Amino acid sequence: MEVEERRKFGLKSLKTIDGEVGDEVIKALDGVAGDIGNYILEFAFGEIYNRKSLNLKHREMITITILLSQGGTEPQLKVHINGALNVGLNQEEILETFIQCIPYVGFPKVLNAVDLAKNGYN
């Protein structure tokens, strides 16, 4: 896939998942770390998110699980919780995703994610 095609797919995926917030992230990087914005658009959202085997709901569920597990990624986790809602996950599915993480990452990280989600739902 050519760069322009990846960029086109990336912009479409980013808009579907993150709405205007995603565009704001890319614009904020422009002039400071524009290459990172390009990698986000072309690689993450242009290539990875456009693979066929998983739908966007599954991809966002995986993404929030990874971000929750890492810790220290609260801004990105908040964006992807909203992205999960945008692609059709509901609050119950997001909470169940968090609960599934408890045995593997512990209550503190899960409670932090619940707090972010709760504030995002309101």
Task: Give the location of each predicted region.
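Acidic, glycine/proline-rich low-complexity segments that act as flexible tails and inter-domain linkers
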Residues: M1-K57, V110-N122
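A general alpha-helix detector
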Residues: S13, A44, V79-H80, T97
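Short acidic alpha-helix initiation/capping motifs at coil-to-helix transition points
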Residues: N38-L41, G71-L77
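Structural motif
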Residues: K52-H58, G88-E93
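Short, structured motif recognition centered on aromatic/hydrophobic residues
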Residues: R59-L67, T97-F98
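Substrate/cofactor-recognition hotspot
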Residues: E60, F107-P108
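A short structural micro-motif
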Residues: L68-S69, V87, Q100-F107
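Extended intrinsically disordered, low-complexity coil regions enriched in Ser, Thr, Gly, Ala
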Residues: T73-E93, K109-Y121
